[in-house]
Amino acid sequence: MKLQKPKGTQDILPVAAAKWQYVEDVARETFKQYHYGEIRTPMFEHYEVISRSVGDTTDIVTKEMYDFYDKGDRHITLRPEGTAPVVRSYVENKLFAPEVQKPVKLYYIGSMFRYERPQVGRSREFHQIGVECFGSANPATDVETIAMAYHLFERLGIKGVTLHLNSLGNAASRAAYRQALIDYLSPMRETLSKDSQRRLDENPLRVLDSKEKEDKIAVANAPSILDYLDEDSQAHFDAVRSMLEALAIPYVIDTNMVRGLDYYNHTIFEFITEVNQSELTICAGGRYDGLVEYFGGPATPGFGFGLGLERLLLILDKQGVELPVEEGLDVYIAVLGADANVAALALTQAIRRQGFTVERDYLGRKIKAQFKSADTFKAKVVITLGESEIKAGQAVLKHNQTRQEMTVSFDQIQTDFASIFAECVQ
């Protein structure tokens, strides 16, 4: 049997991983500027953590979750999204306590799992960057969080991103709209897809989110939820729009956008860009003021977003964005002979401890092959160690581009390599 990775997963090899690390580092730096701290939650949770929060009728729960019973007969699921585990952790660790400064700002980077058909930018194991902010109902929190995502895209060099915005209002607004949508869709029930016929009974707002052609036709003239916002909901949405305009962040109102999760209220948003003439959602999120209470905590407003790393990297690649990933070595040590093998080990460690990236030959190859490796690794400096260098206590350093050489003592290399390196590459 030929052993291969499971369908819908990938091996991220070093060249690609360097790009992943760069994007993750930029995200971390950006979030730190907004005073977010990192949180790491388990890759698996109790089934109810996801099903109760995401929604029993969502596609994630009904079709896509990797769930199983463990040896203790506990119903477990691999996490399909990041918000519910973070909210569970917020409540379990009592981050709502008065001594904890509010708002509590958290970010995460990690693997998520959904059983769905693998396609470009969508895998069964995917990696998500997300943020959650707890304790502020201020519309400025909505806008700051959206602006943070926008700031991240700017720093990465992504172009052509459009902010799509909508409001689901509060519970009263949503209930009124739910009934209006049922009244509108019920007469055309038989024209809907099978999934949307089920959604009409369980959660009619899900019909607006359908990608099926017949459902898109059916909802084309559906009533707008914005017509059902009560005074408080309208004031919140107006404030969000006003603040976005104050920050010069362009947006479009998308009344058919409802998000694929049941816990949202008030502001929801997506950042969308175009790749190969197809629209791709690059980031999505919104407000969830009831979720902490649903998990047994006190009433606590929340706002957050998630974005897929694979999709983000795909868009960067399609837009031709060159990430400034560091390549190459500072130093390559060519080794000739058994005595030099030991000396190379000591020199390599000494140079590394001074902050330089170093590689050496381990295979006892001819010098020409070793120099070729130095070129392949894009080494800036090559140090040659042979029997004569060992006897003299000196090494020959060569600039790998200009081929200029200099001879220095082992003592100098071990104590002040920075000065030697600077002189060699100048």
UniProtKB/Swiss-Prot annotation:
Enzyme class: ligase
Pfam families: HGTP_anticodon (PF03129), tRNA-synt_His (PF13393)
Gene Ontology CC terms, in alphabetical order: cytoplasm
PROSITE patterns in alphabetical order: AA_TRNA_LIGASE_II (PS50862)
GO molecular function terms attached to this record: ATP binding; catalytic activity, acting on a protein; histidine-tRNA ligase activity; transferase activity
Catalysed transformations (reactions): tRNA(His) + L-histidine + ATP = L-histidyl-tRNA(His) + AMP + diphosphate + H(+)
Compartment(s) of residence: Cytoplasm
GO biological process, one term: histidyl-tRNA aminoacylation
Keyword terms of this UniProt record: Aminoacyl-tRNA synthetase, ATP-binding, Cytoplasm, Ligase, Nucleotide-binding, Protein biosynthesis
Cross-referenced CDD domains: HisRS-like_core (cd00773), HisRS_anticodon (cd00859)
EC number: 6.1.1.21
This protein's record includes keyword Aminoacyl-tRNA synthetase: yes
Assembly, per entry: Homodimer.
Family: Belongs to the class-II aminoacyl-tRNA synthetase family.
NCBIfam families according to UniProt: hisS (TIGR00442)
Name of this protein: Histidine--tRNA ligase
GN (gene name): hisS
